[in-house]
Swiss-Prot record:
SS bond partners: none
Lineage, highest ranks first: Bacteria, Bacillati, Bacillota, Bacilli, Bacillales
Keywords linked to the UniProt accession: Hydrolase
Origin species: Listeria monocytogenes serotype 4b (strain F2365)
Protein name: UPF0173 metal-dependent hydrolase LMOf2365_1599
Protein family: Belongs to the UPF0173 family.
Annotated SUPFAM superfamilies: Metallo-hydrolase/oxidoreductase
Keyword Hydrolase among UniProt keywords: yes
An MF annotation (GO) of this entry: hydrolase activity
InterPro entries, alphabetized: Metallo-B-lactamas, RibonucZ/Hydroxyglut_hydro, UPF0173, UPF0173_UPF0282_UlaG_hydrolase
Domain of life: Bacteria
Length: 228
């Protein structure tokens, strides 16, 4: 399995002949190396409804026929407002089997809304995501602050990789993300959600260097991937 990073919180997972896009913020993101019109994933997974995470989901899903996995409130909005048909609604605490493996939604401390036609639309609770693919557990924290139940996430799902936001202001900053890494005890920690715009400017290498002894961190450059 290969996992690649494409700026902000967009990652791509390739397992066998299946491609999964997570939070595909591509258009309008000069930190992303992908082109929305070229993406043909089998699945799109969304952590929450903010525009820098939903991104190009509607266009990509309609072009590719991808199944969109997300919280049920966001799923309803995408179906009714944007005409998406292939949607797998879930909620926090639930897990579901798909052709590529299992998805489980966890809590995240953040918001989830958009503005449509001048009105603010709340899109359910934000989530983190635990993927179990090829007997590996991948935790994608989404946008979140630090919370102590991250310890429980790591205990229940021994983690091979954890993707953690470090941008501060809207999410955890580097200091809290380092504590999150301690709580989770993943084999590998990868920072995300930083340097997309000035308000979340951070030094990811400094974050990795700050991790506790015994915790391995890796900065993925845009388009770079890891094999697990």
């Amino acid at each position: 399995m290969k996992i690649s990073f494409h700026g902000q919180s967009c990652i791509k997972i390739i397992t066998g002949d299946t491609t999964i896009l997570v939070d595909p913020f591509i258009s309008g993101n000069d930190k992303c190396d992908l082109k929305a019109e070229e993406q043909m994933p089998d699945f799109i997974v969304l952590s929450h409804g903010h525009d820098d995470h939903v991104g190009d989901t509607v266009e990509i899903a309609k072009n590719s026929g991808a199944t969109v996995i997300c919280n049920a409130d966001l799923a309803s909005f995408l179906a009714v407002e944007d005409g998406l048909e292939n949607i797998a609604p879930m909620h926090i605490g639930g897990k579901r089997q798909f052709s590529f493996g299992q998805v489980k939604l966890t809590q995240a401390f953040h918001g989830s809304q958009t503005v449509r036609d001048g009105r603010i639309v709340n899109l359910g609770f934000p989530t983190g995501i635990v993927f179990t693919i090829e007997d590996k557990n991948i935790y994608f924290a989404g946008d979140t602050g630090l919370f102590s139940d991250m310890k429980l996430i790591g205990e229940l799902n021994p983690l091979d990789v954890a993707f953690l936001p470090i941008g501060d202001n809207f999410t955890m900053g580097p200091e809290d993300a380092a504590i999150a890494a301690r709580f989770l005890q993943a084999k590998l920690v990868v920072p995300m959600h930083y340097n997309t715009f000035p308000l979340i400017a951070q030094d990811p290498h400094k974050f990795v260097a700050s991790l506790d002894e015994g915790i391995t961190g890796k900065v993925l450059e845009i388009g770079e991937g890891i094999e697990i």
